Amino acid sequence: MADLAGFAELIRTEHNLVVVATTRGNGTAQASVVNAGVLDHPLTGRPAVGLVSGGGARKLANLRARPHATVVGRAGWRWVGVEGAAQLIGPDDPAADIDAEALRLLLRAIFTAAGGTHDDWDTYDRTLADERSAAVLITPARTYPKPVS
């Protein structure tokens, strides 16, 4: 398993903004800028890159068909990429042992791992539920290059 410590350290310097790339049906890349963070995968307990995506997002459709993603974070000229299998957990992508309450808490955990804070968690929870938001968890198979100081 690839180490995510350098990735986590690097992305914190840029508000946890990263580019996530998925693969369209025609084989071309689809990329989005998102907030992401490193946290333990709720099903495996191993470190993963997590992000939250609205239910209608193209990246979710791509990941359902081709569950692999690349995430790249940068700070100045330093950058780190993470590649790996992606798992979706959400109202349209159920997972064993993750009920509605566990999903609510997982989405919060990803948001806070990505540096987010909120003054009204009830509103946050309601908005994500209304948007049918899903957790995207990328288990690292490869990281490159090592961030340099």
What residue spans do the PLM features occupy?
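A generic short-segment signal for beta-strand/edge and adjacent turn/coil regions
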Residues: 1-7, 36-41, 48-57, 102-110
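Short, basic/aromatic recognition patches
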Residues: 1-19
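Charged, gly/pro-rich active-site loop segments
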Residues: 2, 78-149
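Generic marker of residues within folded, mature protein domains
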Residues: 10, 26, 74-76, 126-128
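Alpha-helix boundary recognition
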Residues: 11-13, 64-65, 129
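Alpha-helix boundary/capping residues
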Residues: 14, 66-67, 110, 114
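Short beta-strand segments
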Residues: 15-55, 61-63, 69-73, 81-85
